[in-house]
Amino acid sequence: MNRDNMDTTKRKEDHTKHTTDVIEFYEEGTAASSLNIATEKANSSPSILRRIINRAAWLSKKVDAMGVESTGIQRISPYERGTSKKQFLHVAGLWLSATGGLSSMSSFLLGPLLFGLSFRESVASSLISVTIGCLIAAYCSIMGPQSGCRQMVTARYLFGWWFVKLVALASIIGVMGWSVVNSVVGGEMLAAISNDKVPLWVGIVIVTVCSFLVAIFGIKQVIKVETYLSVPVLTAFLLLYISSSDKYSFVNAYVSKGNLDSSTRKGNWMSFFSLCYSITATWGSITADYYILFPEDTPYIQIFCLTFFGTFLPTCFVGILGLLLASVAMSYKPWSVEYDSHGMGGLLWAGFQRWNGFGKFCVVVLVFSLVSNNIINTYSAAFSIQLSSVFCAKIPRWFWSIVCTIICLVCALIGRNHFSTILGNFLPMIGYWISMYFILLFEENLVFRRFFLHLYTKEFPTVTGEINGPELVGSSKEVEKDAVTNIHLLKRKHKVTKHRYNWDKWEDYEVLTHGYAATFAFIVGVAGVVVGMAQAYWIGPIAAKFGEYGGDVAMWLSMAFSGVVYPPCRYLELRKFGR
């Protein structure tokens, strides 16, 4: 009986092997046939198309060989991240270089020069608003280590697969707007120290191209370069404090524009407040990008404090200097002439002028602060473009960095003679959308991911049986009870932390939220922008109540409108769709 069973088993195995051989033979034949058909189509296609494809393939291989970062918007898994404490030092250097530069100082100049505020009024307005902006940027940064995703990729958990594209577009406009401003300022500086021997457009090209050459390589190179640049740049700013100190007696000579009534002065104070808030708050759209290599169990408080102090201290350091220079220019005629002739670059050269040749060298060093800021903008903007469609995501990040550089260069060349107008009217608008994004993220984390996690049935499906890995995270109720932990951290022998996001589903359309609640709240927030903004092209009815030029309160109204609408809409969305 046993022998019969063995014979039967052998016949079944022979039959199975025969069937497998037939299937493999069929698949090989089909693959060969498909390859022949594809080859015939390629051979029959126009020769120009073949040359383009071959050239693109050759270029990609060359770029990869140069060590350019190939990772796009893909999540960095816990296994691929570092554990060295040097990462904290490098990121601290990154923030010192990126935020302690002329791009931050440029907005502070407008307190006295554009809004007619005294030095004391400008200091009070700017320091309070910058602090609030840094708090928002720091809060957004905590999404980086826990997710391993770029900032705008994490926004998919708020806005869903489709609507996040609108947020990504706003992020692109924001960071590229700063790049345009930086390029123009760099051109003005080079023109000022060369007595116009270096035309403004040439300086713009130099700053833009230098930024691109670093940004194309990837996050590791970006962080290293930013760290190295922070030392000479901050040293140059310290020297500018010293060099310009002989004119500080003119600071108090200018009080404020005497032709402004009390209401208009308050409105200008509020508009300058919103402008300075935008300087640091807009970092919230990309801060998480630079923490994706940190261990997944990095304490939130460490990331928050590193980002807050890393952006607050350098911004205030250069901002106060900018207010001093601008206040002197309002009372001291030679500096005023330099500003009228060469913009911010002329004002910086005036501060260094008594040091002659060494002063020119210091101005050139300060140009690197603009390059530092543009490097980050160009690097992060590419990821937002990849979020716009599946097709764009398949195109390497370095290609989109080239596109961003070209766009920045063209816009800077076109708007180079209208710097103050661009800066005063454009930058506050960047702060509008980040205010709405922040309040939605804050409420999602504080309310729904903490108290209503059981409603996320798509993201945390109920699991019966043993949990075997990252694909099975467990039910949301188990997560709330701390019954389910992060399997990755157990394997890496780090401190166990609990999930409140299923980050493994970052690109799963069937799991990610539809984004109806966040998008509707965002649209309602736009209504707050319309009634509260005070710009040259539009003054809202609420903003118009503050003087002749209005007072910009759009950021706070948009945040309030979105914050009130989102909770009930999000609750209904979770109850209806489970995601």
Swiss-Prot record:
GO terms for cellular component: fungal-type vacuole; plasma membrane. The chain crosses the membrane at residues 99-119, 123-143, 158-178, 199-219, 222-242, 275-295, 303-323, 363-383, 395-415, 422-442, 520-540, 546-566. The keyword Ion transport does not apply. Residues 1-98, 144-157, 220-221, 296-302, 384-394, 443-519, 567-579 are cytoplasmic. CDD domains: SLC-NCS1sbd_CobB-like. It holds the Pfam family Transp_cyt_pur. It is found in: Membrane. GO terms for biological process: vitamin transport. One of its GO terms (molecular function) is transmembrane transporter activity. Its main location: membrane. It comes from the Eukaryota. It is a multi-pass membrane protein. Belongs to the purine-cytosine permease (2.A.39) family. Thiamine-regulated, high affinity import carrier of pyridoxine, pyridoxal and pyridoxamine. NCBIfam families: ncs1. This is Vitamin B6 transporter TPN1. The lineage of its organism: Eukaryota, Fungi, Dikarya, Ascomycota, Saccharomycotina. The gene is TPN1.
